[in-house]
């Protein structure tokens, strides 16, 4: 019985990326083009997290609404499309890749600051968010690799690979790549 409890705890922990201590200092890009953030982005890869645990075929739509954007995040679970909606806007100088997000899911509104760690402002974004847990004295990392297409190619792919190789924050071994197969993306009516 104890073995099953330990196994369940290990499985639950592996669904997220946790570290001891405070969130690391990260430096967002300083050449961010907020206007190019708008539109559709495919979730090519991410750190596993319990909110998106079973989701496949993930993508986000950012629709301008004044100085902010409406955020709609979608994914498919067992043939059903799910979405989370909210708003986002730049934190401070819009050239700095720091974006405030306010999203509601599961009846709860969550707020975070998404740090753009790398982007070419056209084809890809590597984003990072950290959540500190005071009780556990540790933090959970969230990482997303977003692309304008379902597959990174050419210069965008090379730039992402080069960033991941040299990143002191993102562990590429922990990234889970999205399934965009016809079966994964199929929505049953």
From Swiss-Prot:
Residues 1-15 form the signal peptide. The keyword Disulfide bond applies. Hemolymph. Pfam families: Lipocalin (PF00061). GO terms for molecular function: pigment binding. GO terms for cellular component: cytoplasm; extracellular region. Keywords: Bile pigment, Chromophore, Disulfide bond, Pigment, Secreted, Signal. It comes from the Eukaryota. Disulfide bonds join 23-130, 57-185. GO terms for biological process: lipid metabolic process; response to reactive oxygen species. It is found in: Secreted. InterPro entries: Calycin, Invtbrt_color, Lipocalin_ApoD, Lipocalin_CS, Lipocln_cytosolic_FA-bd_dom. Belongs to the calycin superfamily. Lipocalin family. This protein binds the blue pigments bilins. Homotetramer. PANTHER family: APOLIPOPROTEIN D. This is Bilin-binding protein.
């Amino acid at each position: 019985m104890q073995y099953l409890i330990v196994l369940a705890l290990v499985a639950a922990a592996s669904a997220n990326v946790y570290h001891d201590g405070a969130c690391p200092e990260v430096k967002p890009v300083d050449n961010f083009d907020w206007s190019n953030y708008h539109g559709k982005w495919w979730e090519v890869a991410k750190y596993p997290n319990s909110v998106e645990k079973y989701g496949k075929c993930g993508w986000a739509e950012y629709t301008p609404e004044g100085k902010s954007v409406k955020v709609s995040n979608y994914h498919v679970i067992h043939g059903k499309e799910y979405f989370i909606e909210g708003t986002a806007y730049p934190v401070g100088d819009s050239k700095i890749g720091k974006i405030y997000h306010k999203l509601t899911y599961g009846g709860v509104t969550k707020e975070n600051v998404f740090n753009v760690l790398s982007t070419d402002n056209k084809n890809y974004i590597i984003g990072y968010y950290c959540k500190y847990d005071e009780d556990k004295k540790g933090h959970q990392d969230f990482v997303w690799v977003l692309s304008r297409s379902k597959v990174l190619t050419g210069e965008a792919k090379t730039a992402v690979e080069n960033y991941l190789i040299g990143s002191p924050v993102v562990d590429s071994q922990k990234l889970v790549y999205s399934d965009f197969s016809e079966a994964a993306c199929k929505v049953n009516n």
